[in-house]
C-alpha cells in the first residue's frame, strides 16, 4: 500500500471540503474510522477483505495526549461493477455519512491504472490539518482502503485494551 503513503501531511486549504466536527473523543474517532470502512464495504462488498492493518498513532505535540486511529484493508475479489462505478458508489456512501465532496480521480502512471479517491484534498493532495484522510483505489478484482482518523485529544488505548486488542484477544 505504498500509494497511501504518498498522500503527504499538508495543512488544510481554504477550499477543503471537510464537513466533520473534529472535536470528538478517542472512542468517537475510532468509531468514525469503522463507520467509513463500513460505508466502503457497503459498496465494494462485505466479504473478502484481508491484509487488515489497524493501529493507533500518537499525534499530540508539546507533551499533550492525542491519538489517531488508522485502518487499512484490501479486497482481491471481482468488483460489483467497473472501477469507476464502484468508486462513484463509494463517494455517495461517504457523502451519506457526512463526508461530502470526495471525487473520483485516475492514476494513469501506475500499472495497472487505478481509479482513486483521496479525501479531503484529492489524489496526492495531502491530509486535513489534523491528519485525517481517506484513500481508496480500485481496479480489476482489487480494492483497498486506508483511513487515517482524526487526531483527537486523549490517550491512545494501550495494547490489550478494548479499542486496541491483542491479536489473541480477537474473536
What are these regions (language model features)?
Residues 5-8:
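C-terminal motif of bacterial Sec signal peptides marking the signal peptidase cleavage site
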Residues 10-14:
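Bacterial signal peptide processing site
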Residues 27-43, 125-171:
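Extracellularly exposed regions in secreted/surface proteins, prominently low-complexity, repeat-rich
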Residues 27-71:
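Compositionally biased P/S/T/G-rich terminal and signal peptide-adjacent segments
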Residues 67-120:
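Long, charged/polar, surface-exposed segments that mediate recognition or autoinhibition
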Residues 15, 65-66, 157:
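Secreted/processed peptides and extracellular or luminal domains of membrane proteins
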Residues 1-2:
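Sec-dependent N-terminal signal peptides
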Residues 21-32, 78-82, 86:
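Extracytoplasmic/periplasmic, Sec-exported soluble proteins
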Amino acid at each position: 500500500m505504498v500509494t497511501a503513503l504518498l498522500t503527504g501531511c499538508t495543512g488544510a486549504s481554504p477550499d477543503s471540503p471537510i464537513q466533520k466536527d473534529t472535536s470528538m473523543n478517542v472512542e468517537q474517532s475510532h468509531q468514525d474510522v469503522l463507520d467509513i470502512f463500513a460505508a466502503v464495504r457497503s459498496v465494494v462488498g462485505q466479504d473478502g477483505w484481508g491484509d487488515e492493518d489497524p493501529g493507533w498513532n500518537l499525534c499530540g505535540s508539546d507533551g499533550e495526549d492525542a491519538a489517531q486511529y488508522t485502518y487499512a484493508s484490501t479486497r482481491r475479489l471481482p468488483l460489483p461493477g467497473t472501477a469507476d462505478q464502484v468508486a462513484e458508489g463509494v463517494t455517495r456512501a461517504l457523502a451519506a455519512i457526512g463526508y461530502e465532496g470526495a471525487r473520483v480521480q485516475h492514476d494513469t502512471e501506475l500499472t495497472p491504472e487505478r481509479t482513486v479517491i483521496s479525501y479531503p484534498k484529492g489524489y496526492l493532495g495531502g491530509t486535513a490539518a489534523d491528519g485525517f484522510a481517506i484513500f481508496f483505489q480500485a481496479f480489476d478484482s482489487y480494492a483497498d482502503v486506508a483511513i487515517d482518523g482524526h487526531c483527537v485529544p486523549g490517550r491512545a488505548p494501550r495494547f490489550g485494551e478494548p479499542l486496541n486488542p491483542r491479536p489473541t484477544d480477537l474473536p
